[in-house]
From Swiss-Prot:
Reaction catalysis annotation: RNA(n) + a ribonucleoside 5'-triphosphate = RNA(n+1) + diphosphate
Keywords assigned by UniProt, alphabetized: Hydrolase, Nucleotide-binding, Nucleotidyltransferase, RNA-directed RNA polymerase, Transferase, Viral RNA replication, Virion
Membership in a protein family: Belongs to the reoviridae RNA-directed RNA polymerase family.
Residue span, RdRp catalytic domain: 610-805
EC annotation from Swiss-Prot or TrEMBL: 2.7.7.48
One MF annotation (Gene Ontology) recorded for this entry: RNA-directed RNA polymerase activity
Cellular-component GO terms for this entry: virion component
Domain of life, source organism: Viruses
Protein name (database record): RNA-directed RNA polymerase VP1
Location in or out of the cell: Virion
InterPro entries: RNA-dir_pol_reovirus, Seadorna_RNAP
Keyword Nucleotidyltransferase among UniProt keywords: yes
Gene: Segment-1
Amino acid sequence: MDIQEQFEGYLREEVDLLNKFEDSHFKQLEVFYTNSQADHVINKDKAQFSDLPFHTTLYKEVNGKRVKLGTLLNWTKAERLDTIRHESMIKDERLRRLIDFDYSWIDYAVVLQRYLDEGNVIAPADILKFDSDFINNIKHPTEKNNFLDIKVIKECETYILMKDDNGIRDPDILRAWELDSIPDVIELDVDGEVKKFNLRKEMIKRIQDEAPVYFFASVSLCSRNLDPNISEVKLWLEYFIGSEDFFGFNGPNVVVSKSLLAAKRFEVVVNHLRKVAAFELDDESKEVMTEWLKYIMIDPVYRSYKNRGAFGNLNQHVFARTKSEGLSWSLIDIGTTNFELKPTKKLAGSYVKKFNLVDDVLVEESLKDLRNEGLYKMADITRRMIDADITPENVKKGKLNRLALSYCGYTGSHSATAMVKQFNGTKDLDPNCDPMFVDIVKDNMKVYMQEGLQKYPHGSRKINRLDILFKGGTSSASSTNEHATVNGRFRYRSELYRERDVNSSTVFKTATAGQYRVVKKISAKLKSKNANIITHPMNFINSKVSDLDVVVNAGSRLVRGTRAKRIITPNYGTIYAASLMTVLPAVRLLSSRASNMGALSTQGSLVDRAPHDVMAPQLAVTSSDDVSKVCVAKDFGQFDTSQWGQISKAHADGVRSMKVHYSMGHDALVDLDLNDASFADLLEVTAMSFEKPLKYKMNGLVCESAGVKSGELTTQTRNTTTNISHSTVALDDYNNRAYRLNLPKLELVTDNKVGDDSVEVLRVVDGSPLTPEIAKLYVSCMQDHADRNHLEISAKRTIVGNNVAEHIKIWVFKGYLALDVFLDSVTSEKNSFSNLNYLEQVNILYDMAMTLMIRYCSVQACMTQFCNDMKLLNGIRAGNYTFIPTPKIICAYGTPEICLRAPEIRSFGRYLPIDKDEYSVLNDLVASLSTNKPKMEFVSQMIEQNGNKVHSLWLDHFKRKNDVNPNGGGIHISEGLKRLMPEYCEKHLNELVYKTLDDKVIRDYTSDIIISNICKGKLSKAPKLAFYANFYLSLTNTNGVDSPYLTADEGVKNVHRVIGLSYRNTLSTSPTSNVDRILRNNPGSAPAYLTGNDILGVLSDYPYQNWRTVVELLDITEPSATAIIEVATNQMHAYLADKDLNTANLFDNTSRTYDISDRTYPKFVNITSSLSNSNRRGFQIEAMKHVIYMARRGVAVLANTHPTKIGNTVYYDY
């Protein structure tokens, strides 16, 4: 069989897989919702919603063929479900109490009753009782007791949980205590006065704040896949049923019956089953994870938290003493920003002994800690991995402790306590710092400011400042006290209700039978930063000296890995605006990385690059025979808040040093107007915001935060400055000490510092091998200089060596890399998943699968989980109806458009040999699911009821600046162009403001429109494919390298072998991002409300010869005008593909590692020469999708657009 026939055969198999997926999907729905009772052909049968049965299958008929659209559920007929899940079937008293507690468990109760009827028993488990010593940890800081001498507290109306000799360990971590064992009310002595404290109520409140459970699907559906015969499920059932440790939901909030963490136990067992399956763990690894599951089930969050230290101590040493060979990467150019992974051959028998510093005492202590907890299997397997051979299975074994910490999903700690601990940081240490270190911090900040302002001087020019403010600069938070409000009533008509739904407030009858008017009251504040800038610009423009004393609302976020809650500290509006003008250039400087420079030049990090780019130097060092090269990774703790006092003053002075270059400044802070202020005065505002501790409030607590603020614009820049300075003094100190001790010197070759994360490559200057003496001395120097400057660093967690390295949770060993396991989670940090529309939910599940595939999972495991998860999605609900689309939409235009065996190749579904009519219907179905008309109708009604919210300052600022006649130009002015022209921009600006509202009624109305239109046969028309061509394949030569992604899917590694590894993702930047960059770098040359998406959208409606006129009508001037036209000329193909699909960009977490670039196109693609450059690039990408598909199977092919002879067959493109 020739290669073309093989390829076509593979695609036919893909269609068969899709059909099987669809069949299994609908069979699962029959399990959930009983068998379908009727078929409804939307373009033939009339839709009388009230007449439809509970479970209907929807079709569209085309050319005599029926195409399945999905399942429609009519909840007014839901009594049909009761015949299979009637309460009378539940005999076990515990199960009856379960459904009394929360009736949504009825389906699972039926499953469990059958299990019990078969003679099985569910025994009770022992639930943890309240520890009365905890009461001693409850503290009440007050002004009278000097806030317990905690200096950061300025006001307090709440309690905190602090260490006490008579208390419990880590009181701020929520325990799984039995509710009835927690005292309802206790008496506490507060400043000599006895006060009553509602302890049980406070503990229950903590559940939602510290251990919420937001599943991606309803818990009742998730539980249906929990077979009670599985041993791990039996363990959970001993709590859930045996001890009646029930949980349910009141809206998004967890409600419990018996213990505080009943829902977390459920999440733990679900996560365990998913991860064991997805990671395809071997029997030994399964035993380790089952041991862990049994251990943490007793007290999930705390038992995870208490082992974090031991796990971290051991995790860094995986493969540290391995003797196995790895890959071999060249060290050529490692000292420049052009360094790229390139393989090099090792000489036969050239094995050299490498070295990594391992603290054996710490290892043994950590192993002992694990064994003391009963985690013998975890301890043994982790210890073995220090010396183990490097294999895919051993990499997984080495990461089992990380996997274990992911079981609890998102958790946090007591909010007020977290705030005190985080703000206090290292305040108890000596406030004095090493003067040399402080000077280096200042000098580094000065250099970043100087080079940043030279490259991006726009904020120093008054004419640009409003444009910079409007753009907002970054996603960093800001806080103000004034916000616009929106009040009104949103109205729409619906046929998805019935008579008994009518009430006096939201659902009303109309004169038309079967139609109802839905009215929802709207009352909201426009709190988004972008909306606030448009509605209240004076909150950002008029700066007062007292603004640095304003108490700002702090935020918080939960994290995975059972760590303490993170407190977010944004800047006040005027301080944020000053930062945009002054230090944003330095932020951008450190976010870019120019080519053809020395690796140690002032530059950015590689944090946003593919992992093999980020870690390229470390991959080369750990694989090289040059044992004089050394990788060093530091581990800072509390880094933000440890930079108080003299360090923050050094940051401030580095900013202040720029004042000498600008006139009319004052020596101290003054009230100012952003538009007229001297740039020197703006620099002083920024400097003082660094130097002066700022106040934040949250949950009845006001605290003062010194050091780096975790939500400010310059968090990463300031952290990077201090990080580099610490490395500088530590290296200088090492070389001074080494000289005295007769040890060789070290020199820095390259580094990558991202905030508090740091990885360096050093070289032993005389070329001798790294030795334990060198490593220990360098670690000692790093520790000493942290101690001298009230920084917190763990010497025992510092990695030094040339066998293994780590940076930003990417581990490197002998030329291979492993990524983190904190990916797949059935829950999210906030209740955000349920607020997404159906296609967005599918995309998140898909992205999760793609991330797993490049890390630890096979395509089979990833897509099995993806398909199973899709079956659990709730579908689209409106009124009394739910529509669940066919899962085959994943291959349709407007979704990831994938095939199941090569899912990372987005928009490849168009090449599957699916029936033409069926594919057209699926595309139209996706277009119907993607409608944004309801959102725009909501915005329109709110504008009509609330009027203009755009501040007059902006309407005046955006008046046309060029002298172009808006009615001239000789071209037809489309509605899309008109709305973006300065003369008509008020409506557009108001839409930007109102669109920031995300009210539930918008989702309800959108769902209503989708269901109504689909059932009535009013499918939207899908856009035409931007690019499609028949390609003919022939064999060619491979061009790639052995993959460093050792545990990735085998097909992914085949692509690396056939095509190669990407380099800096040069083609992954979207056209809209490129236009946005032009606008950002040239403020004032275009109205600031324009985006790359706006401009390219309008240009795509016009022929090329009209583009200059369109740009002028948009009031875009030079230098942006020509640059934008150039981007549009070269990249309109990519925009057209991205515009309709939204997910069509080829680059995701997996495919961005593939070398799809100008250097691989000539080797794998042969495009007809008559195409324009723009179209040529579009078809080159389409052709590469075919090449990647075959490369996954280890076959290198050339994709041709013209007829070619393959074997005995000649293929023609008709």
